[in-house]
Amino acid sequence: MADVKITQVRSTIGARWKQRESLKTLGLRKIRQTVVREDNAQTRGLLQVVRHLVTVEDVK
């Protein structure tokens, strides 16, 4: 499967608990921090919850 590069671009101040936990599960703690994760259903579900806090790019 392909990978996705996820970068946190907005703060979690004012975010709901589920959004903070989703970012923690993805491995993001700071603004402009980037992680590479496998593109699967679980990752896509987490990204759906925090789509307004992150940017997503495909990695080939």
Curated annotation (Swiss-Prot):
Keywords: Ribonucleoprotein, Ribosomal protein. One of its GO terms (cellular component) is cytosolic large ribosomal subunit. CDD domains: Ribosomal_L30. GO terms for biological process: translation. The keyword Ribosomal protein applies. PROSITE patterns: RIBOSOMAL_L30. It holds the Pfam family Ribosomal_L30. It comes from the Bacteria. InterPro entries: Ribo_uL30_ferredoxin-like_sf (IPR036919), Ribosomal_uL30_bac-type (IPR005996), Ribosomal_uL30_CS (IPR018038), Ribosomal_uL30_ferredoxin-like (IPR016082). One of its GO terms (molecular function) is structural constituent of ribosome. Part of the 50S ribosomal subunit. Belongs to the universal ribosomal protein uL30 family. This is Large ribosomal subunit protein uL30. The gene is rpmD.
